[in-house]
């Protein structure tokens, strides 16, 4: 996940980071923590393919430090790149909203990037307290799976829009459930779970919801947080660890985790995608997307090119040489489709398919069903602190929408 301001100390308040750069109105960071975050962010300048993403992160940190001049100055540089960052949609900038300079910047962004809507309603839950994070599709059974952070369960959704528990809340005493994917080989279901005290598990269920295994990293004294994952045909799983800024490969036969070495340090890794031929895995973090060659083990950052950003992708998916991203870490959320070059290392075309519409309330992830992309419209993760609902009166039925991939 990713939202409620990029900050929340992606280094120091892991669950908040996981739940996205705009996710939770949780604990207020002190100046010492924010200064540490600022220093860490500055180290990424010149080290990534997307300068705008680093600038947006720094501007938000300055805003939280109540340094309006530095925040606006940094935002001006970011907005001038015309990549799509929209500070109006990020709570970190709440203290600047009465500033004329800030208003001028957001007006410019909205002129450059007008609202777009191509989606239509798909499903609506009757249950209000789900607060979902992950969505997956099982083509063999023609069923969707929705993970619940608050109720700590997994729900199955039929094509008719019928919701039923796949793994009930009290069955296995699960942690909050995040990313979820289906193993196409045997229709089993894998999911990531994570509580903000640093407890995290990789879960494996059969296609009837029976728990086949739950796996944790060896104790190392650090806080970890599994977030999203992909499943290879051989049964191995790649999973992002948002809290500790790493990616792991879980070897299913040996039941062992192996850390993946990447070309640069990560900042809250989140969404992850697997190419159809399983030649590459794409890892999203707050600053962009890295491609990992599964044969050589080498990695490199995907270059978005000018006037484009791959940053802040909570959900990331591969479809016909394209990446589909649910970007809720760039201010106002959007869903975008990125056509890639033959080597998978450059964006050749960007198509924003949903932005500043009634379907981008607070999206987190989605799932592909053929050429249609289904996604969570209103996750409500901003009403959750850890596994506690902040205001029960604000809970709403979960809306899921769909759109056709261009």
Regions found by a protein language model. Name each.
Residues 114-117, 121-155, 396:
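Beta-strand-rich domains and repeat architectures in extracellular enzymes and scaffolds
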Residues 126-141, 149, 171-194, 218-237, ...:
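Beta-rich, blade/repeat-based domains predominating
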Residues 111, 115-120, 199-236, 240:
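Asp-box/WD-like beta-propeller blade repeats and closely related beta-sheet repeat scaffolds
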Residues 158-162, 206-210, 251-255, 293-298, ...:
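Short loop/turn segments that connect beta-strands within beta-propeller blades
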Residues 149, 194-196, 242-244, 284-286, ...:
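Short loop/turn segments immediately following the C-termini of beta-strands
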């Amino acid at each position: 996940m990713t939202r409620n301001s990029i900050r929340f100390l992606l280094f120091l308040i892991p669950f908040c980071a996981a739940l996205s750069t705009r996710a939770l109105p949780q604990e207020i960071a002190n100046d010492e923590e924010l200064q540490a975050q600022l220093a860490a962010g500055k180290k990424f300048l010149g080290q990534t393919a997307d300068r705008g993403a680093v600038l947006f992160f720094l501007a938000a940190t300055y805003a939280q430090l109540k340094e309006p001049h530095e925040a606006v100055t940094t935002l001006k540089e970011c907005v001038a790149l015309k990549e799509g960052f929209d500070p109006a949609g990020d709570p970190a900038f709440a203290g600047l909203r009465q500033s004329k300079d800030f208003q001028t910047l957001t007006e410019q962004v909205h002129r450059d990037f007008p609202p777009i809507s191509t989606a239509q309603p798909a499903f609506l839950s009757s249950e209000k307290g789900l607060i979902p994070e992950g969505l997956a599709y099982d083509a063999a059974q023609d069923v969707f799976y929705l993970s619940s952070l608050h109720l700590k369960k997994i729900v199955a959704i039929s094509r008719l829009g019928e919701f039923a528990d796949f793994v009930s809340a009290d069955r296995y005493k699960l942690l909050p459930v995040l990313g979820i994917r289906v193993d196409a080989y045997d229709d089993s279901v894998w999911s990531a779970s994570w509580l903000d005290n640093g407890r995290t598990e990789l879960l494996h269920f059969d296609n009837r919801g029976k728990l086949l295994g739950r796996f944790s990293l060896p104790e190392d004294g650090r806080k970890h947080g599994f977030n999203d994952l992909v499943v290879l045909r051989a049964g191995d799983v790649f999973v992002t660890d948002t809290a500790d800024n790493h990616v792991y490969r879980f070897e299913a036969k040996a039941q062992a985790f192996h850390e993946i070495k990447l070309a640069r340090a990560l900042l809250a890794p989140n969404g992850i995608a697997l190419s159809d031929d399983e030649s590459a895995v794409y890892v999203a973090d707050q600053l962009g997307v890295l491609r990992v060659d599964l044969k050589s083990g080498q990695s490199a950052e995907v270059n978005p090119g000018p006037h484009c950003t791959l940053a802040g992708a909570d959900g990331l998916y591969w479809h016909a040489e394209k990446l589909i991203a649910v970007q809720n870490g760039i201010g106002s959320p959007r869903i975008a489709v990125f056509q890639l070059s033959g080597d998978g290392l450059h964006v050749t075309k960007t198509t924003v398919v949903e932005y500043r519409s009634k379907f981008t309330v607070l999206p987190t992830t989605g799932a592909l069903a053929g050429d249609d992309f289904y996604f969570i419209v209103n996750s409500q993760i901003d009403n959750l602190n850890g596994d506690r609902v902040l205001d029960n009166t604000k809970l709403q039925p979960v809306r899921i929408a769909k759109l056709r991939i261009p």
